[in-house]
Regions:
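Acidic/histidine-rich catalytic neighborhood of metal-dependent amide-processing enzymes
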Residues: 124-125, 129-209
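Predominant activation on well-ordered alpha-helical scaffold segments within soluble catalytic domains
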Residues: 49, 138-145, 174, 240-248
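Flexible glycine-/small-residue-enriched beta->alpha junction loops
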Residues: 113-114, 207-219
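Acidic-enriched catalytic cores of C-N bond-cleaving enzymes acting on peptides and small amides
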Residues: 183, 199, 208, 215, ...
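Generic secondary-structure signature for well-ordered alpha-helical cores
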Residues: 27, 53, 149-152, 181-182, ...
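Short small-residue beta-strand/loop micro-motif enriched in glycine and branched aliphatics
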Residues: 125-127, 224-230
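Acidic/His- and Gly-rich active-site-bordering loop/insert found
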Residues: 1-130, 149-154
Length: 294
């Protein structure tokens, strides 16, 4: 469904206001991985909650409790749940995003102050969180603002889940999702994660699938004391070489997973999906550029 022309005109006319709002968001150093900045993460939660209410979203800030970091017991920043629309004839879409950021300083190689939104000569805006993930979150806010100001009905019901710990392991999120599965998340038909990347800097991209993560822990035991390799080498098993042998059986030199049955669990790309790939604005040069290749 294409965007209404009047919406696009409104976006153009509201450009300065959007940039000012993003500039304010970027100026809040909501660094979740540094205890000293925990109050600023909560400040970001409070500000975003207020902005959502202004455009008609019913919100709830959720106390996620405390956690221990660097030997300190700290309060987790409040997550924000939001809802707008409850039409049983419409689909319900859950929007996820986060308002915390990674640390940033000029000494890290930034050409400008990271927490000051800066306009480059080519028109691009640079600032910590401008793309990951405050910019995308504020994009939703802009859409809601237009619908609110023009009283244009939304085509779907929306639910929101915005957190302030994504850059630090999303502590508290699992418990929140479980506790609200029949509450704020009840009746959700699909989900949009507003925290992803374009394939390049030229063409907007919609990501419709993500790889999952599986973590395993293995302990390899060896001799009960430090042994001299000149005496015990090749006589007693060395834990390091045993571990190397084990890990070498998981993948081959091309990165193919060697665990039996794993590939059988992956759905094959259909004709329609392959046709989408063939039309993507994506090339080997894009891969090399993103990886820092020469």
């Amino acid at each position: 469904m294409p965007a209404p022309p009047e919406f696009l005109s409104w976006v153009d006319a509201s450009k300065d206001a959007f940039i000012a709002r993003l500039s304010h968001a970027v100026s809040i150093p909501s660094i979740s991985g540094d205890p000293a900045y925990r109050p600023r993460v909560q400040e970001m939660s409070d500000w975003l909650n207020s902005e959502l209410k202004k455009v008609g979203v019913e919100t709830k800030q959720v106390d996620l409790g405390n956690h221990v970091m660097d030997g300190q017991t700290l309060p987790l920043p409040n997550a924000i749940l939001g809802k707008i629309g409850n039409d049983k004839n419409k689909k319900t879409v859950l929007i996820y995003g986060h308002f915390d950021v990674q640390p940033a300083a000029l000494s890290d190689g930034w050409a400008s102050e990271p927490f000051v939104l800066t306009t480059l000569p080519d028109g691009r805006l640079v600032g910590r969180g401008s793309s990951d993930d405050k910019g995308p979150v504020l994009g939703w806010l802009a859409v809601l603002q237009w619908h609110h100001e023009t009283q244009t009905p939304l085509p779907v019901n929306l639910r929101f889940c915005f957190e302030g710990m994504e850059e630090n392991g999303s502590e508290g999120l699992d418990e929140l999702v479980e506790s609200e599965r029949e509450g704020w998340f009840g009746g959700v038909d699909c989900m949009c994660i507003s925290d992803n990347y374009w394939l390049n800097t030229r063409t907007p991209a919609l990501t419709y699938g993500l790889r999952g993560l599986v973590y395993f822990k293995i302990n390899v035991s060896g001799p009960g004391r430090d042994l001299h390799s000149g005496v015990f080498g090749r006589t007693v098993h060395e834990p390091m070489t045993d571990l190397i042998s084990l890990l070498s059986r998981l993948v081959d030199a091309q990165g193919r997973i060697l665990v039996p049955g794993v590939d059988d669990m992956v759905s094959a790309a259909g004709v329609e999906e392959r046709s989408i790939y063939e039309k993507l604005d994506y090339s080997i040069a894009d891969v090399e550029g993103a990886a820092g290749g020469q």
